[in-house]
Amino acid sequence: MANNSNSGSELEVDDTLQSICYNRGSLKLLDQRKLPLETEFLDIRNSSDGWSAIREMVVRGAPAIAIAAALSLAVEVFNFDDFTGTSNDAASFLFKKLEYLVSSRPTAVNLSDAANKLKEVIYKAAATASDSNSVFQAYIEAAEIMLKDDIASNKAIGSHGASFIQNQLKNPQRLSILTHCNTGSLATAGYGTALGVIRALHAAGVLRRAYCTETRPFNQGSRLTAFELVHEKIPATLVADSAAAALMKDDQVSAVIVGADRVAANGDTANKIGTYSLALCAMHHNIPFYVAAPLTSVDLSLSSGKHIVIEERSPKELLNSRGGLGEQVAASGISVWNPAFDVTPANLISGIITEKGVITKIDSSDFDIKNFVKRTAGQSVA
């Protein structure tokens, strides 16, 4: 990938809180591995660059990687000057590239969901187009709509979540929220999911304090979430992952809000490793535990979380400091187990906050997500 440090006037200061900077034919991704100490954008010229950026954690967060993948291919086909195939050839090319991009990170359903939706656009375009350029144009426009829709979706999640939590909790004027990993502007096209709810609570004047975990081993909480909270001037405290239970015991947490990489039909949720531990602690201390995610994170094809494929990351992330980017800190020869995600069972989750509203349980332990999706299918995001 070409390297383009942020030293000119093209990218303004506030863009440091945008992981995706796109204009038709051009895509730059903020290298989140270097935050918060260095701001650097990488030029993404094609789907190969996009795959590498996602796999190597240049960009992360389920919504963000879906958008980045789609746009990396949009940039590639926009800049084609030597494609001589038919409309069907163009469709075949796009299908193969989308499958390739989906393989970059298998746990996040947003990526495969975006690919499937884009394939539908490609099918329709190829059936009526007279040339390859028309198919490529249809794809580019669809990818750009996804970028726009993600921002609107995130703001709706924030609004629904803030209203719901204020109505559910005691003393809603003095809320302290604990979150895990990074679910803000850097993990999405903008605003954020779980962190978007925290932003909305702060804007409403009811947030006393946000707590963010460091989120080892890649430190998305200490490097990214803390960075966003400081930038937004939201009162916040960083805690070690291992301090979360003690924080809850000391009655410092009103609710826990996390994001999601994949939600099964029954509500079981795959999210950053350590989420399950937080949910167990929250239940023990009678603290509500919420998942905030767009409906694109829901995978109705999976009946439960036992079917979710969990990505395992490089041992180097544990063996070396700075999530694998620094010097070795562990003994040579030690074996490593480094799952990127865990699955929190639905019985530990109080509600799932989406852009269409909050999914609550039909009884003590079960969510009827299929019915919620069906019931809100024609409902606009607001």
Curated annotation (Swiss-Prot):
Quick one: where is this thing mainly located?
A: cytoplasm
Q: Which GO terms describe its biological process?
A: L-methionine salvage from methylthioadenosine
Keyword Transcription tagged: no
EC identifiers of the protein: 5.3.1.23
For this protein, the record's InterPro entries field holds: IF-2B-related, IF-M1Pi, IF_2B-like_C, Initiation_fac_2B_a/b/d, M1Pi_N, NagB/RpiA_transferase-like
UniProt GO cellular component terms: cytoplasm; nucleus
Pfam family membership, one: IF-2B
Active-site annotation = 261
Q: In the record, what terms sit under GO molecular function? A: S-methyl-5-thioribose-1-phosphate isomerase activity
Q: What metabolic or biological pathway is this protein involved in?
A: Amino-acid biosynthesis; L-methionine biosynthesis via salvage pathway; L-methionine from S-methyl-5-thio-alpha-D-ribose 1-phosphate: step 1/6
UniProt keywords, alphabetically: Amino-acid biosynthesis, Cytoplasm, Isomerase, Methionine biosynthesis, Nucleus
Q: Where in the cell is it found?
A: Cytoplasm; Nucleus
Q: What does this protein do?
A: Catalyzes the interconversion of methylthioribose-1-phosphate (MTR-1-P) into methylthioribulose-1-phosphate (MTRu-1-P).
Protein's recorded name: Methylthioribose-1-phosphate isomerase
